[in-house]
Amino acid sequence: MGDTAPPQAPAGGLGGASGAGLLGGGSVTPRVHSAIVERLRARIAVCRQHHLSCEGRYERGRAESSDRERESTLQLLSLVQHGQGARKAGKHTKATATAATTTAPPPPPAAPPAASQAAATAAPPPPPDYHHHHQQHLLNSSNNGGSGGINGEQQPPASTPGDQRNSALIALQGSLKRKQVVNLSPANSKRPNGFVDNSFLDIKRIRVGENLSAGQGGLQINNGQSQIMSGTLPMSQAPLRKTNTLPSHTHSPGNGLFNMGLKEVKKEPGETLSCSKHMDGQMTQENIFPNRYGDDPGEQLMDPELQELFNELTNISVPPMSDLELENMINATIKQDDPFNIDLGQQSQRSTPRPSLPMEKIVIKSEYSPGLTQGPSGSPQLRPPSAGPAFSMANSALSTSSPIPSVPQSQAQPQTGSGASRALPSWQEVSHAQQLKQIAANRQQHARMQQHQQQHQPTNWSALPSSAGPSPGPFGQEKIPSPSFGQQTFSPQSSPMPGVAGGSGQSKVMANYMYKAGPSAQGGHLDVLMQQKPQDLSRSFINNPHPAMEPRQGNTKPLFHFNSDQANQQMPSVLPSQNKPSLLHYTQQQQQQQQQQQQQQQQQQQQQQQQQQQQQQQQQQSSISAQQQQQQQSSISAQQQQQQQQQQQQQQQQQQQQQQQQQQQPSSQPAQSLPSQPLLRSPLPLQQKLLLQQMQNQPIAGMGYQVSQQQRQDQHSVVGQNTGPSPSPNPCSNPNTGSGYMNSQQSLLNQQLMGKKQTLQRQIMEQKQQLLLQQQMLADAEKIAPQDQINRHLSRPPPDYKDQRRNVGNMQPTAQYSGGSSTISLNSNQALANPVSTHTILTPNSSLLSTSHGTRMPSLSTAVQNMGMYGNLPCNQPNTYSVTSGMNQLTQQRNPKQLLANQNNPMMPRPPTLGPSNNNNVATFGAGSVGNSQQLRPNLTHSMASMPPQRTSNVMITSNTTAPNWASQEGTSKQQEALTSAGVRFPTGTPAAYTPNQSLQQAVGSQQFSQRAVAPPNQLTPAVQMRPMNQMSQTLNGQTMGPLRGLNLRPNQLSTQILPNLNQSGTGLNQSRTGINQPPSLTPSNFPSPNQSSRAFQGTDHSSDLAFDFLSQQNDNMGPALNSDADFIDSLLKTEPGNDDWMKDINLDEILGNNS
């Protein structure tokens, strides 16, 4: 057991250490590196300790038998003499006997035992007595100046037979023999490194001799060391250093040995100390080492590998690691090394004081010897001993954490010993006053180091990131103390992480945003983290660069601290950097020049964007019906002009800010090249970047949603990448900017519409099909709508009441809707460009929703449009409502095609939804949340928190689009009625915004949507298609239709019936939509297109109908977290018994799985 387990532990420790070392080396920043190294050390120490304990057990049996045969006398003497150390001494003795047995089972080891017996008689430390005596004998010889000779003479002989036997054992037992050899070391507690028992014995003896010479008395020292030694032995890591340190001590007699230990420790980077090579302090030990390792070449190889690993860690010469790698490694290490997490910072602090490492090692090893306070406290701290020395490089940084050593002096000393006080190899020798002085000095050094690190480490890190700048090494980012640096590091690719890691103060905010920007590559969860909490950020990226950094709050805290103001101020410059592809890698180049270039690029991009917008407007207009063209042209042209003006102003402001920030912090900015910058998505088109900058910069300055905006940017950038036709990222950023965004968003939407000409053409074809389907569905819906309405009223009168109010609002704004349709067209363009996939999903959802709702749907779809306004939520929610609704409608029109094209781009699954949802959903969502704040708040809050709500807004928009179509066909009154019963509730959140939007939508709906009616069915079909159409319709009818149940059930069924046709055409859309809707479950559950979108855009469901949305959302996602299980159950319970059929089709596994 022990034998087998120990190898695993050492293998895990060594392998983990080596892997961690490589990874840690990859970490650019010394902090993360130190944290990783410390964790590696801790893990190695734990593995070694475990391995030693197992080996100790295994070898105890063997060693006891062999040692009892050979050294039974020595063991008895050592056990008797060292009463306290009897256990550990027994272990050591057994280990020693085992070492003697394994290394020199023949008399030659016995001869050293004999010598050690003589020494034992001379010196009373028996438990390790064999070791102590042998060591003392060696110490005496070393004091005599013959330590090397004696060690070489005695130990090599011991190791020579040991080598023979070990070679035989290696051949026979292989790793088992290595374990035995290691056990020899572990007997000395240095096995893990594979140190020879003799070397350890020498070390122990040396240490004992040192302690004795130190004046503590051989017995006491032997006792302490017997404890420490035994403790150290289990500490295997410490034994390596200890062995190295002690051998150096052996060279010098008495305190001289002690001083030598310190010197050699200092000389030793700590790397060799941890490794068996530093046994070379005594060539004898090395000889013994090789001899015993001769049997254990693997062990020796392990130690050199560890040395190299630790050297790399200490030198931080390893190539930078990617943030994900560091994050994964650190998280894994944290999970595995949780007990050491606290120690990591301390260890880094402890490890920083190299000179004390010998003592630390001793103390660490003394873990096994609770008798020594050093041991217990030092062991966790010293578990890095093998890696600890490697921290010599990190000592400056570690020293900052050294104040932790100010733990109880007993513990603090082990810690501080590693920091400074432990410089004395014989820690016990240091007087208590001296220890206190050392602790104080360590604290002072720590404070100074923190200051210097904060001041200099950023530059050092900046140097590291600059060297690794393009590389995604997250730690280079840490040097982003300056906001400008953090901002630049915010470049679209990897800068988000750099911002986090980089600036300690400004980089805090920047880091948060940086992470937000960076998540684009890593997915929307980062965006969510961005919005949610700096903690989340720290969890995501910050964990990678700062796990070790975190102990140093000076640099780490700023990153974790989420300062909306700072972030707002910093983000503008960061956004421009994102806009600039050249900013992908911010090296330490002159940032001002870059900013100027960026400004020029932005201006050029703005011009290009304006031109493109005009062209896109023309194209879109040409592709859209005359009415739509006129409305879009009028609204887009005006909006584009406004947006362009705003964008230019914003860009100018941003450029000015960037210049100022860069000028203020040009030194920190070089780190912007932080390797994490590439983490951002592929650079967006300059125009899109400019739009994103403008859109984001405006809202960021005044909005608290900067994080979400950045997230949106990420999403948008994903959308832009995924959807070639539309610069979706720009419109996304526009809605983020707020009401001002609407103009820029509209311009972006125009651009997107231009880019989506082809999708519009496809949609036109689809719309024709959809018109037929819609007509059929409308006929069915008209039939089913009254029943659904009755069912809805019966099942949920309050939501229906609200829905009725909304319907009233919808009916009134019908005239407005046409007026707002131009804005809507812009919004829909925006939605199309940004959330092409999202809106696409929404559009089919709305089609399904309207289909299922029948007449009801038009109102509901209008409400959905208003909900779609959610996207602009962070910015101008009310303004976004009307505009977004129109845009959503346009998006709905385009969405069928875009759905086909963009849905084909599953890449959009979440970011697109987020992007568009951010635009439309946010604003609409905000409005909806205002109106439906009570109902929607739980869900809206979630949706607001999570990107899905934004999607929901898109869904809302889609359904709204469908609603106008239905309204035009069936009549606004029926639509309003249907919405009143089922649809109105859907935009419960936005009664005010919803009403005017609905009126506009209905007016326009009859006009535009009559044409668009076809497209919604296509959209509707994909939405239904998202899941098995029957299952979708039934499930959605039961759940999603919750509020819509009566209408939704039958209309959904009708849609499912019609959808089979649509399914054929829309199957691709559904598939792509499913891909687009990140939660495929959302798509199926989404079944009523509003539900699907709602599920995808949970916010919409919440805004529209929390009640039925619970069902629909939970069918889709089980309300990814927005809808609680209780809500889902409530929706199920509230569902009418007549609609129970949907429950039959519900796939609880899918729902629950999606929800989980």
Swiss-Prot record:
Coiled-coil segments: none
Region (Disordered): 81-165, 340-359, 369-506, 531-630, 658-680, 705-743, 784-820, 1059-1100
Subcellular location: Nucleus speckle
Site positions per UniProt: Breakpoint for translocation to form the CRTC1-MAML2 and MAML2-CRTC1 fusion proteins: A171, L172
Superkingdom assignment: Eukaryota
Alphabetically ordered keywords of this record: Activator, Chromosomal rearrangement, Notch signaling pathway, Nucleus, Phosphoprotein, Transcription, Transcription regulation
Bias kind Polar residues: ranges: 153-165, 344-354, 371-380, 393-419, 428-437, 484-496, 532-543, 563-587, 807-820
Pfam family, one: MAML2_TAD
Keyword match Disulfide bond: no
Tissue: Widely expressed with high levels detected in placenta, salivary gland and skeletal muscle.
An annotated GO BP: positive regulation of transcription of Notch receptor target
GO CC terms in record: nuclear speck; nucleoplasm; nucleus
Phosphoserine modifications at: S175
Biased composition (Low complexity): 113-122, 440-470, 588-630, 706-725, 733-743
The UniProt record lists the keyword Phosphoprotein: yes
Example of a GO MF term: transcription coactivator activity
Disorder noted: A chromosomal aberration involving MAML2 is found in mucoepidermoid carcinomas, benign Warthin tumors and clear cell hidradenomas. Translocation t(11;19)(q21;p13) with CRTC1. The fusion protein consists of the N-terminus of CRTC1 joined to the C-terminus of MAML2. The reciprocal fusion protein consisting of the N-terminus of MAML2 joined to the C-terminus of CRTC1 has been detected in a small number of mucoepidermoid carcinomas.
Family named by the database record: Belongs to the mastermind family.
Free-text comment about domains: The C-terminal domain is required for transcriptional activation.
Function: Acts as a transcriptional coactivator for NOTCH proteins. Has been shown to amplify NOTCH-induced transcription of HES1. Potentiates activation by NOTCH3 and NOTCH4 more efficiently than MAML1 or MAML3.
Subunit structure: Interacts through its N-terminal region with the ankyrin repeat region of the Notch proteins NOTCH1, NOTCH2, NOTCH3 and NOTCH4. Forms a DNA-binding complex with Notch proteins and RBPSUH/RBP-J kappa.
Protein name: Mastermind-like protein 2
Organism expressing this protein natively: Homo sapiens (Human)
Lineage summary: Eukaryota, Metazoa, Chordata, Craniata, Vertebrata
